[in-house]
Amino acid sequence: MKKKPISKLFLYRYRFIIGYTILGLAFALLLIVLPLIAQRGLSDAEIESATSSYYLGKNGILNGDLVDLPYRLLQKYSIVFFGLSAYAIKLPSILIGLLLGFLLILLLNRWFKSNVSLLASTLIVLSTPFLFLAGSGTPLIMLAFWPTLLLWLGSKIQGEKRPKPAYSLLFSLAMLVSIFTPYMIYFALFCVVFVILQPHLRFVVKDLPKLPLALVGSVILAGFVVLGINIVGHPETLMELLFAKGFTIGDFFGNIATGLAPVFSWYSSLEGVFLSPLISLPTLALALIGLFSTTKGFFASRNSIATILLVFGLVITGFNPDAVIFLILPFSILVAHGLKYILEKWYSLFPENPYARISALVPLTILFGLMIIPSLLQYIYGYRYNPSVANEFSDNLTVIRNNLTEGTVVVNENYEFYKILEDKTALTILNEQPQDATELSFLGKPESVPENYRLSRIITSSKRDNSDIIYLYTFTEKLEGE
C-alpha cells in the first residue's frame, strides 16, 4: 500500500486549526477558573478601583471624572449586578483579558506565519504577567488592550488594497474611547507620528479611499474636541491622563528603575503586586534574538514597531512604575520575531527534507513545556505562598461574605468600599460603634471593648499576617452585683 505523503495527512493539513482551537479552549477555560487560582484577595489598587467605579455617577462624569471611564463603567455594573465580591471586581478584567488574548493571537497571525504566531501566542497568553493582568480588578489591563486592538485594526486597514470602511470606523472609535485611559493620548500621537515617519505606511495612507480617512479623522477630531472642552473646566483630568497623581519630573528615572526591577529580578523576591521575575530568562532570550533579527530591514513597519513600543513603554513607566506591564505587547512581537528567526535558520539547514523539519518539533515542545509550565506554576503558587507578594492582597472581603450574612459590621478603614455590601446583603456597615446593636462584628481587633459586650467569636483567615479578621461581640445585660 502506497504511503500518503506527510502533506496529505489530516493532522498535518489541519495542524494550525487544531492548534488554535486547543489554545483557544485552554485559554478560555483558564480564564473561567481564574478567580479560583488568581491572586488570593484584593490589593489596595483593586479596592480603590472598585470604590471609585461603584460611586461613579452622571454628575461625576460631567464634572470631569473621565479617567479610565470605559473600564470603570464595566466594573460598576459588574458590582451592581453581582454585588460586592472579589469575582465581581475582577470580572471586567477577565472578560477584557479573554478578548486581549484573542486579539494578540489575531495580531501575530496577521504579521507572522501560522506556526510562529501559534507558538508565540501560546507562550504569551499563558505567561505570569498576562494572567496577572486578566486576574487583577484594576484598569491596568487597558494599557495593553487598547494598543493591541488599535494595532490589529490598523493591520486590517493597512493590509488591504481597499480596506472596509467598517474597520476604519472601528479604529477611530477605539482610538476615541482609548484616550480616557492614562497615557493613551501619547499612543494616539505616537500612531500619527509613526505613520508620518514610516515610508511604507505613509504610502498606504495616501492610497486609502477618502471615505475611511474621513471617518477616522472626523471621529477622532470630535473626541479630542469633547475631551478638550472637559479639560478646560477640569485641568486635573489632563494631569491624570498624561502623567499620574502626584508625579514630578524628578520621579521619572526612579519610576523606571522601580518598574523594571521585577522584570530583571531572577534571584530575589520583591515586595509588590508583581511576581518576580516578571519575564522569564528563556522568554527574554527569545525576545533579544527577535530584537537582533529586526535590525535587518528595521524600517519595515513590522520590524520597527516593537522597538518603538519598547521605548514608549519605558517612557510611560517613568510616569507610573505599574505601567511596566505594557511591555507585554512589544515582548509578544519580539518573541514572535525570535521564533521566526530560529525556525527559518533551522529550515534553511534542511530546505528539501520535511522529516528533518518536523524533527524540530521535539526540542521545541520540550523548550515550550519548560517555559509555559513553570510560568503557570509560578502564577498559581507564587501569589499564594510568596510572602513578599501574597501580603499585598487582603482577603477581608471574602472572609466577611463567607461568614457573615446579617448584623452590624464596624470597619475602621475603606469604609466606602465595605459600605457597598449593604446593597446585596443584610449587613449594616458602620464606621463607628452603635449604641443599640445586640451583636457587633469588628473588622480587625477593636481598640476598646464596647461596654456590656462580650467576645463571642473570632473569625480567622488562613493568610499568615491576617489570621484574626473579624471579632464578634454579643450584648449582655449587666448582672446585679457586677
What do the PLM-derived regions correspond to, one by one?
Residues 338, 433-482:
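Aromatic/acidic, Gly/Pro-rich catalytic loop(s) in extracytoplasmic/lumenal soluble domains
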Residues 339-378:
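Signature aromatic-anchored transmembrane alpha helix within multi-pass, membrane-resident enzymes
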Residues 129-142, 183:
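Short acidic/glycine- and proline-prone juxtamembrane loop motifs at membrane-interface regions
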Residues 1-33, 192, 198-221:
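Start-transfer (signal-anchor) and selected internal transmembrane alpha helices
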Residues 134, 303-351:
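Hydrophobic/aromatic-rich transmembrane helices and adjacent perimembrane loops
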Residues 91-111, 149, 288-290:
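Transmembrane-helix motifs of polytopic, lipid-linked glycan transferases
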Residues 49-56, 183-295:
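Transmembrane-lumen/periplasm boundary regions of multi-pass, lipid-linked membrane glycan transferases
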Residues 60, 110-112, 148-170, 177-178:
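Membrane-interface transmembrane helices that cradle and orient dolichyl/undecaprenyl
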